[in-house]
Each structure stands twice: as C-alpha cells, then as structure tokens.
Amino acid sequence: MANSPDAAFSSPALLRSGSVYEPLKSINLPRPDNETLWDKLDHYYRIVKSTMLMYQSPTTGLFPTKTCGGEEKSKVHESLYCAAGAWALALAYRRIDDDKGRTHELEHSAIKCMRGILYCYMRQADKVQQFKQDPRPTTCLHSVFSVHTGDELLSYEEYGHLQINAVSLFLLYLVEMISSGLQIIYNTDEVSFIQNLVFCVERVYRVPDFGVWERGSKYNNGSTELHSSSVGLAKAALEAINGFNLFGNQGCSWSVIFVDLDAHNRNRQTLCSLLPRESRSHNTDAALLPCISYPAFALDDEALFSQTLDKVIRKLKGKYGFKRFLRDGYRTPLEDPNRRYYKPAEIKLFDGIECEFPIFFLYMMIDGVFRGNLEQVKEYQDLLTPLLHQTTEGYPVVPKYYYVPADFVECEKRNPGSQKRFPSNCGRDGKLFLWGQALYIIAKLLADELISPKDIDPVQRFVPLQNQRNVSMRYSNQGPLENDLVVHVALVAESQRLQVFLNTYGIQTQTPQQVEPIQIWPQQELVKAYFHLGINEKLGLSGRPDRPIGCLGTSKIYRILGKTVVCYPIIFDLSDFYMSQDVLLLIDDIKNALQFIKQYWKMHGRPLFLVLIREDNIRGSRFNPILDMLAAFKKGIIGGVKVHVDRLQTLISGAVVEQLDFLRISDTEKLPEFKSFEELEFPKHSKVKRQSSTADAPEAQHEPGITITEWKNKSTHEILQKLNDCGCLAGQTILLGILLKREGPNFITMEGTVSDHIERVYRRAGSKKLWSVVRRAASLLNKVVDSLAPSITNVLVQGKQVTLGAFGHEEEVISNPLSPRVIKNIIYYKCNTHDEREAVIQQELVIHIGWIISNSPELFSGMLKIRIGWIIHAMEYELQVRGGDKPAVDLYQLSPSEVKQLLLDILQPQQSGRCWLNRRQIDGSLNRTPPEFYDRVWQILERTPNGIVVAGKHLPQQPTLSDMTMYEMNFSLLVEDMLGNIDQPKYRQIIVELLMVVSIVLERNPELEFQDKVDLDRLVKEAFHEFQKDESRLKEIEKQDDMTSFYNTPPLGKRGTCSYLTKVVMNSLLEGEVKPSNEDSCLVS
C-alpha cells in the first residue's frame, strides 16, 4: 500500500507544496493578553465556517461524509456531530450582546441539519412501522442518505444500515438542543413520528446491530451483535426524552414524549451486564467513549465507568490516537479495499498495525472538562497538538486516522510503536473529517471556558457523583444509590364476601366498589390505552406496539379521559398458563416484584403496588401461605422490602401520577372502551368455602393399561370408547393426545372437539393439582407462558447462550434475542421428541432461569451455555439421588414452585457431602467449568499445532488463533461447541478436568508441546486403563468397562483421577520432540 492515495498525499514533498494542508505550527503561538471575547469567538467562527459550514448542503442541511470529489453520501451520526459543533459555538455567542447575527446563523445551521435528518427519517415512516413490529436488519431506518436530496442510498445488501446508535444520538441531541431554546419540532405529525422512534429505541436491548463502525462483529463478515455502545446511547436517549416536551417552553400536554420505564430498565440492566465488553467479539472498543462519557453519559455506576474506561485506555490508546478496536483492518495497507467482507482468519493480518484515530483524544479532553480533571484535559491536548494539521488558510484540521505505511508494516509488527505513522490527509477519505472537526470545536470551546458543560448539556446527562443524590433527574439515571424505599401497598379483595372472610383474620382489604371513583384496571387495558400513543394515519403509524406494562409502569397512577386509574401488576393476571395456579409461585413472584421495584424505582413519589386477592387463592392448602404473606404485609416488611399497607384513597396522594393526555378524543370520535376490574357479586350472607384442592387418590394414578405405546396403534373407535369409559384425567389426556395427532383438533368427541375436551381436562387437572396431567394437556394445546422472550433475553445479556431441546436429542442454540413466536416454534419442534410434557417444563425453567440470573448471576458462574434439556436431566438425576433405593419422584408431578426450588438446589455451587460421581454428573449437566478454563484451552491450543479432538469434534489451531483473541467471548463459545458433542455429563466433566491438567503440565514444562492432534478421548481411555490396573492390583478387582468407580474417585490426592490423567498426558508429550532451551542445564555444548 506504499503507492496508495493516502501514502502519496502524505509525503513531505506534497505537504510542503500546500496543495492539501500542512502540519499545524502556529497552534501554540501566544495570543494577545488583551484578546477580547469577540476575538476568541471570531477565531472559532472562522474555523467553523471554513472547515464545516461551507460543506453543509443548502437543500437538506446534511453534511457529506467526504469533502471532495462531489460526494453524494451523508451519514446520520456524522451530520449530528456537525450540527452539535455549530450549536456549541452558537451557545458561546449568546454571551455577546451584539453578535452580528452569528448566533442566529449558527443555531439555524444546527436546526437545518436536525430537520434534514428528520425529513430523511420521516420519508421512511413505513420502515419505522415495520421495525417497531419486527426489528430486523432489513426493516430498519437507513443510516446513509443523499446529501442533496435526502433520498435513501445503498440497499440493505450493500450496507449495514441497522445502527441504533445513530437514531439514539439523534434523539439525544434533539432533546439537548430544544432544551437550550432551539425550535426543531414544528407540528403534531413530527411529535408522533418522534414517539414512534422512541418505540423502536426502547427494544434495543434485544436487537443486535452493526454498531458505530458499521461492521457488526469484529470479523467483518456481515453478522450483527448486541453492542454496549448502542444500548448505552439508547439508554441515555430514553432517559433524556422521557416526559420531555418537544415544543419546548411553548409546548402543551400533547407534545410530550412517553417512555416505557420497564423497557428502559431492561436497557440499563443489559448495558451493565455487557460492560466492560463492547460485544461478544469486541473485548473492548473506542466506541464506548461517547457512550460512557460525552455525549451520552450512560453509566450510573462510577466503578463500572472506571473499569470500562481503564480497559479502553489500556488496550487501545496509542501515540497518534486510539485504535477503534483490536485487529481492526480499516484503512490499513493490508486491507483489500475491493472487498466488503473479510475472509476467515484475515483479521490476524491487522494485529498490531491498526490505524489510530486522534478524535478519541478529543473525547478524553471533553470528559476531563466535565469531570473537572484539568490534568486529563492538558494531557490529551498535548497529545493532540502535534497531530493536527492546517488548511491553506491556516485553520486547524483533525486527521481522520494515522496509518502504518506498507513498507513499515513488518517492522511495526516486530516492534510495536516503533514506526512513524502518516495521516489520512486525503485520498479515499476526502480532505476533511467533519466529525473530528466538529468535536474539535466542542472540545476547544470547553477547554477555553467559552462554554460550560451545563451549556451543552442542559438536561444534565452528566451529574458529578457528589451531587447525584440531590439532583432532580428524569426518573432513571440517578444510579444504583442505596435507598430505603417504602413501597405503598393496597390490598384488594375480588368480592365482598372474601373481604369479610379475610377480616376475621385481621386482614383489612377493599373491594373494587369501595375504591370508587378510582378504577382498577388490568395492565392489558393500559396497553390498550397506549395504542393511541403516537398514532398517525397520514404517516401510516399505528402507535405503541402490543407490549405488556411491567412492574414499574403499574406502580404509577394514571389520569385517563378524566378518570383516575390504578393497575395491578401482570403477575395477578389470570394467565392461560398453568404456572399461575401455583399459589406458592405467585407469592414468590410478589416478593420478587417488590424487590425489583425497590431496586429500580427512581421517581419522586412512592410506588403503589396493588395486591389482588382472588377467592381461588385461598382454597384448600393454598390458604395458609397466602395468610402468612398478608400477615407479613401487615407487619410492614416482606422479602426484605419495607411496605406500608393502607387504603387506596389514602395512598394516592404520595404516588406518581401520569397524565395520558394523548387520548384526545374529538366529539365526532367514538370513545375507546376500557374494562375495569369488576367485583364478584354473590348472594348476601354467602360465605367463602375453603374446599380441599388436594388430589383425589384414584385420580393421581393412571388407569391400568392406558399407555401411549399400547393405545397409539388402536383404532379411533376403540379410543373413543375407552375415553367415554375412562374416569381418570391422566388416561383421558393420553387418549386425547393420540386423537389430536391422528384426527386433528376439530375432531368431535362426547364433550365437543378434541381441543375443547383437552382444555376442560386441563382446567380440572389444574384445580386438583395433577401437575403431570396439566403439563401434558398444556403441551397438547401448544400453550406458551408469558414473558418467555424477555426471560431468554435476560440470559443472553449476561453473556450466556441458551439451548432448547431434550437431553440426548438435537438442540437449538439461541445466541441473539428472538420473538415469542420463533421461540414457541423451536420449543414445540425440538422438545416433544420423546415426552410431550418436555415442551412446557422447558418453558417453566426458562422463566425461572431468567429471574434467577438477573438477581443471582453468581449461581451461573462458569456456565457459558445454559442447556435447558441438560438442566432437566440434572434435576431428574437429583431426584433419583434423593430417592435412594425407592422409586424416584417424577419431575413432571412436582408443582411449579417445587420445580423452581429443585432448580435452585442444583445450581448451588457448594456440593459438599456429595460423592464425586454425583458432583461430576451435576456439574457436567450444568456445563459448569472452573475459573480461567477457556483461557487455559487457548494456551493449550498455542502448543498444539494440530489442534484438539473430542467426541469426533476437532478444534484446529488455525485459523482459530488467527481469527480470535484469548479473552474473546467467541473463542469460549467455540470451546463449548467442541464439548457439545459429548453425550454423558460425567464424562464431559472428566474432559474438563483433563484440559485443566494438560494446561498445567504445559505451563510447567515450556520445552514440551504436542506433535499430533490431542485426542482427549484416547487420553481418558488410557488414564482409565491405568486406574483399572491399580484397582486390580491393590483391591483385586477384575477389570470392567464400567467407568463408575473412576467417576467416583476424587480428582486430587493419592491415586486421584488427576494423577492418572497427568501420567498419560506426560507420556503423550514425551513421545514427541523436546525443544531445547538456552538455559537448559542438560545441554553439554
């Protein structure tokens, strides 16, 4: 690449000619002591006019990506920074009374650009509507437009347009600029469009995108990833725009933007889970700087901020700027400019010669100003100064990047940092890098104290740590401060007779009629009200998508069409899924919801939590647990959360009230109908009957002879006859399942269609607590639990993968968030291979795991892949161990709350008291690995030219080591993929132990390496053979193929498994060549 345009135009001879621009020599020349404010601002005004505004399109207001050669393309995020640069200088000119019209000019240059982007976006309103319903790379807003016409450029196949960070940055700067007094939004069409952009951004936590660098994963192969920088910018934008009036001081109630607090909170949790990583393939990335610092200031946790920033600086900072990320091939001489995507392992070529970008020194300068760290400002200003160049007029220019010329590449790789780098003065990237120019203006205005941080951050995205407790924030970025929140609780009984019954136990409740005129709504009615938010027929926008309202949303009071409305949380909905019939699970959900509200409630005013008590909750054995919970409410503390129980009318004064004024209904429009929660009416003096809900003895068992194996081959007539005679619900479900598969759901039985008959059996079995029958019926009806997709997302954002499918059968790996419909199809396709009940119990586990991993992530340490089928296998194994010599309890007969407790039991890492066979079986089923396991496999691979083999799966040394880095998430997943072929949990755990042994042996013997493939199966076989020889010699036991005794042997100690594994590993290594060392004392000469 020595003859590349970049190299040619960077030569000293050409720089001296002045035809492009020269190194900046005058930047440190002393200015007059008596320089006036006008002179200072005039200096920057001329820079802005000459290096930025002269390139702004006179028609759209957009800025081109390149400033030479008639460039047609304009990228949204670059134009946004240009607008911000002009706006920042306008803010400085506000300090001068007679500004000669410059404030107006600069402000309206920014407004023109912002409205230009809005114009481009609004022409794609159909894409917003599609993306809102189905977020995919082929339904998103474009990120590149024609600079002169605003037309969309480049198809989805030609360019990765899915860049949520661009939309988020637009919303963030929109709020900041309007807050400073600019008028950008003109009418209600634009307000409704912005509201719909918010709907799109709310779901960022589950939408992998291409990121700031437009490349997706680090491998640049067209795949998308969940990026911390995108999620962080979305979080910041949502916090800034929540409750914001787009008309500024002249606004009214219907120009206010609404944000779903629960969706925002999921973005917050996702961001904290991903950091300090940027994504699965990016261990760190300079794109995190604008996320954690200016302009987003997305982090509330100071420790996490420091950890993330330190990692960026440590790994990416150089003499000429920051690398974007490690092994970034962008504009390096070894990158092929004619290919959009890289080949496998190609990124290894760019290791150590990544371009360095001075723009990130500017971000660090701005960060220093905001944090009052003058040393940081000076440090990065001193680093930046020698990198700046100047135009022929003498104005400073920030080069886009500095690169290593082709002739110097080998020397740079041998000795990093030794070679001179050259700036990207022109060539493919144009004369000026406008993003850098804009940020230079902002940084210098701040450093010279011509504007203050409060000027360019009027909504106070950045708040110093010492002020965070006292600042009136917009609900959510006050951070994880310790709080002593008291949750207000109102107890509502569904009928008057239930109220009287509870009163006899000293539990004071209210009925829906007694709280009037306040109405009690299920959250689904609130969702219906929100359908009207952002609706716009002219633009073809339908308003808020059908998404449930979470615990934070239902903890507010709403004013809707003159009514005062409170909502009970979704956990009290009468779900179609059987888990809601387990009252112990309901109590657990209530405690979890209260703890969640305590942790994440950041609003002024107290949360209002409605507890809805139904008559069905207190029947039979359900009564005592419910009574204990209500007594805990009365005492004022439940699950570690302080609560205050009172009448709803009393609590309403301290709550947060949300005015839903977007429900503007004209006289000609029909009022939307909302159904409030109705009180159950019963005859006077009737009493609540606490009838038993325990299973009748005959119902609990199958009728003799009714098995799927026997009856699936009998005629339909025979099955119908047996169905009519069968009084056992379990038998009926089996027979109905056979009919369903054979004849279809609409086949007529004595009790209507097959599907209706199964539904009735499902209800009856639920009331009798016949959980195995309930699960089979639920599976036959293809029922799906609520919150399935969010639960899987909770697992994914913790850096894990989820696999669905039965143990020993094909599994589906989920790496990115999916829609509920897709997850349902996977579950019912993969899980019903050998037992119909598997599909629904896997859903139960997904819900439980989603909750547990959010609240106790340490229980999943060492588990990179959450294999649901294998976890079920571990639970069944645990039941066998507990049963001893007796028949094991059937997992499917346990209640959902018992299943959850069993899951928690096996997840506990301390398994002391168990035999080693049981430990290995459980840990293998959970896919648990020791600390630093994947790093050690990397080190093994470095010393194994032909790779590693296990269970027929080969992990090659190349291109693995070339394509990846040691600490990369994708390498760990590759190792998991290799181990995924092992079909026995305890054997998998022995393989994990073997890999740790191999790593330690290689670490202590640097002169050794494997000459051939490391066949792990062969090594275990040889170790077991050695173990058998010792067993037969010492204990006089005949050799057996059964490895149970080996699995049950402790790893350490005399004749532990590690002793045998170490022996065979050393034998294998010593069969190869020993590499001599200069320090080897065995050498004679």
Curated annotation (Swiss-Prot):
Pathway given for this chain reads: Glycan biosynthesis; glycogen metabolism
Keyword list (alphabetical) reads: Calmodulin-binding, Carbohydrate metabolism, Cell membrane, Glycogen metabolism, Lipoprotein, Membrane, Phosphoprotein, Prenylation
Residues bearing PTM Phosphoserine: S10, S19, S693
Query: Where is this protein chiefly located?
Result: membrane
Task: State a single Pfam family of this protein.
Answer: KPBB_C
Q: Which domain of life is it from?
A: Eukaryota
Q: Where in the cell is it found?
A: Cell membrane
Organism, by scientific name, is Mus musculus (Mouse)
- Could you tell me which residues belong to the region Calmodulin-binding? 760-787, 912-943
Spell out the activity regulation. By phosphorylation of various serine residues.
The entry describes its oligomerization and partners as: Hexadecamer of 4 heterotetramers, each composed of alpha, beta, gamma, and delta subunits. Alpha (PHKA1 or PHKA2) and beta (PHKB) are regulatory subunits, gamma (PHKG1 or PHKG2) is the catalytic subunit, and delta is calmodulin.
Give the residue numbers of the S-farnesyl cysteine lipid attachment. C1082
**What's this protein's function?**
Phosphorylase b kinase catalyzes the phosphorylation of serine in certain substrates, including troponin I. The beta chain acts as a regulatory unit and modulates the activity of the holoenzyme in response to phosphorylation.
Protein family per UniProt: Belongs to the phosphorylase b kinase regulatory chain family.
State the membrane topology. Lipid-anchor
Which Gene Ontology cellular-component terms appear in the entry? Answer: plasma membrane
Known post-translational modifications? Although the final Cys may be farnesylated, the terminal tripeptide is probably not removed, and the C-terminus is not methylated.
Query: In its UniProt entry, what is this protein called?
Result: Phosphorylase b kinase regulatory subunit beta
